[in-house]
Design a protein with these regions (language model features):
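Short, intrinsically disordered, charge-balanced linker/junction segments flanking boundaries
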Residues: 1-3, 168-172
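Beta1/beta-strand and adjacent pyrophosphate-binding region of the FAD-binding site
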Residues: 4-16, 34-36
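Structural motif
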Residues: 9, 32-34, 71, 171
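Generic N-terminal leader segments that precede the first folded domain
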Residues: 10, 15-18, 41, 49
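Conserved structural-core and active-site-/substrate-pathway-adjacent residues in large, well-folded domains
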Residues: 10-12, 20, 77, 161
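Gly/Ala-rich phosphate-binding loop of Rossmann-like dinucleotide-binding domains
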Residues: 21, 25
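Conserved S-adenosyl-L-methionine
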Residues: 26-31
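Conserved N-terminal/central alpha/beta ligand/cofactor-binding core
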Residues: 38-169
Length: 172
């Protein structure tokens, strides 16, 4: 056959690969992009566990952890909107840059259909009481607003993103 020529090949269609492709498109890179993923497109990912009530160790790969959007497609879809949780990103790139990056990623989820409601904000008095109890117990309470996508909604959002990438010339 005819050899295919790409400017950029993205290995893996998890969140990092997805956002890389979105950024290339939006920054006007004008590149021919191929995204390689060993799993299925989001709309073809099915887990037999819902029928069998047990994991059957699917071969060659698990449809829950592998495929477009990675394991996130079948989680409960919670996005932590604070750099206070989830790793060392603030130490690596600075707190303000980490917060701006989280807000930017969140704006993309909103654009593709995420609910605008954010959990964990607007209950300052209750949080203040819980914080006092945590301190007394030797704990540190971390405020972390959460955008809850929900499992079904997460799949809809990732499907919309997948279609956006395809419509913008990304080969998968």
């Amino acid at each position: 056959g005819v050899p295919m020529k790409y400017d950029v090949v993205i290995i893996g269609a998890g969140p990092a690969g997805i956002f890389t492709a979105i950024e290339l498109i939006r920054k006007g890179a004008n590149k021919k992009i191929m995204m390689v993923e060993k799993g299925q497109p989001i709309e073809k990912r099915r887990c037999p566990k819902s029928k069998t009530n047990k994991c059957v160790n699917c071969k060659p790969y698990c449809h829950i952890t592998t495929g477009f959007s990675g394991a996130g497609a079948f989680s409960d879809g919670k996005l932590s909107l604070s750099p206070e949780v989830g790793g060392q990103l603030p130490e690596l790139i600075g707190y303000d840059v980490a917060q701006k990056t989280i807000e930017y990623a969140d704006s993309i989820y909103l654009e593709f259909g995420a609910d605008t409601h954010v959990e964990g904000v607007g209950r300052e008095e209750e949080v203040k009481e819980i914080r006092k109890r945590a301190i007394k117990a030797g704990l540190r309470l971390v405020d972390c607003p959460i955008r809850h996508l929900g499992t079904e909604k997460a799949q809809d959002i990732y499907y919309a993103i997948e279609q956006y990438l395809i419509e913008n010339g990304v080969d998968m």
